[in-house]
């Protein structure tokens, strides 16, 4: 399952105001620039462990940017397992499902989010098919590569998983 082999970054803005959305992107840039420890990870487990070991550092990086921009928002960084709908990031489509993620919430965390994949390093570098193949099996690579016919299949997965979730 693709959801078991990737580790996501999920940043939620305080609100949907332009200022809060701009702040979210500044926090994103600072976190991605400072968190070079993800580029050395050789497995999804290593990436999750790197995030957990550096939560305080990640929080402080975000907090510094927020203060620098003149805001007094609280910020939290934590590793979570959450449901995500089908998403597209550059040349990769991730099917709906439960994923582990480094989640950074700015203030109320009520604004639109920004996300990417920390492992394999899709948001840290220009990820190629060869990069993905090093960590995902052939079927998983084919599944997540953008192409015709995937939207319907992913929608079916979303519907199935939402029904399953409601029955539990």
Where are these regions (language model features)?
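Soluble extracytoplasmic domains of inner/organellar membrane proteins
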Residues: 92-150
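Amphipathic, coiled-coil-like alpha-helical scaffolding segments used for oligomerization/assembly
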Residues: 45-86
């Amino acid at each position: 399952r693709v959801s078991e082999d990737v580790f996501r970054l999920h940043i939620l803005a305080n609100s949907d105001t332009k200022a809060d959305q701009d702040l979210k992107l500044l926090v994103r840039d600072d976190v991605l620039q400072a968190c070079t420890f993800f580029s050395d990870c050789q497995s999804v487990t290593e990436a999750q462990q790197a995030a957990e070991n550096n939560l305080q550092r990640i929080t402080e990086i975000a907090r510094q940017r927020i203060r620098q921009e003149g805001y007094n928002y609280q910020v939290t960084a934590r590793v979570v397992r959450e449901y995500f709908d089908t998403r597209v990031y550059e040349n990769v489509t991730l099917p709906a499902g439960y994923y582990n993620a480094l989640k950074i919430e700015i203030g109320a965390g009520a604004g639109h989010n920004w996300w990417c994949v920390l492992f394999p390093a899709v948001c840290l570098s220009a990820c190629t098919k060869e990069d993905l193949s090093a960590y995902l099996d052939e079927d998983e690579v084919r599944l997540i590569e953008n192409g015709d016919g995937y939207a319907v299949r992913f929608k079916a997965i979303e519907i199935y998983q939402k029904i399953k979730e409601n029955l539990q």
